[in-house]
Amino acid sequence: MNTLATPTGLSAASLRHSVSDLKQDRRNEPHVGEKSAAWCLATFTGRLTELSGELSGASLSLVFGLVLEAQKQAEPVAWITSRDSTFFPPDAAERGIDLAALAVVRTGDLLETAKAAEHLLRSAAFGLLVLDLGTDTRMPLPVQARLAGQARHHETALVCLTVKPAKEPSLGSMVSLQAHARKVQQQGRIFRCRIEVLKDKHRGPGWSHMEVGRGPDGLC
């Protein structure tokens, strides 16, 4: 058992205050991968979600956390994109993501991305689908309705990543949860990403989430 020695000349009351201050400091320290209770895979299961950011790094960092959570729960994950460049694999691996278990589907355009997503949703084999759309947000409402319906029916989390300002409207009315991510602080390889929920059909808008991570400079 470890023992705590009282330094000469330090009263018991002073020691109690010192220990209390130390505990408070530890509570205030950022924890890598820290999450709020609402920001978890269960929040997005069965829903069409849009996660946007003016730069893709912040939203990528936050969705990596959901991918990792899904993999820890043995839920298969697929990443679908029509973009020429998407996430940097070493960044994902450093977050703990098993790249060998992550299915990546590349398509020609947004409609092909939506068709691939619908096909994978109908298979009922995936717990999380990420649609990396970039700046292309012209998804027709009937397509959104089909995707949202399949996500709900098969209890799959369907997350669309978009690159745009927070003031721009969501993909459409079928989006159940819309959130905007941004980097608020970075010191070396430790960064903070904040997400503001702009629309939530289940809980209502206005809640936020802060996540602390560690990664290559510029990831967030």
Predicted regions and their residues:
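Detector for small/aliphatic-rich hydrophobic stretches
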Residues: 1-79, 94-97, 200, 220
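Conserved RecA-like P-loop NTPase ATPase core
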Residues: 51, 102, 129, 151, ...
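Charged, alpha-helix-enriched surfaces in structured cytosolic catalytic cores
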Residues: 58-65, 108-115, 138-146, 153, ...
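Hydrophobic/aromatic ligand-binding patch that stacks against planar heteroaromatic rings
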Residues: 69, 120, 150
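Short glycine-/polar-rich loops that comprise or flank the Walker A/P-loop
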Residues: 74-75, 98-101, 126, 154-157, ...
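Conserved inter-motif catalytic segment of the P-loop NTP-binding fold
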Residues: 74-142
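A contiguous pocket-lining binding segment that forms or flanks enzyme active sites
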Residues: 125-166
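Phosphate-binding/switch region of NTP-binding enzymes
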Residues: 158-220
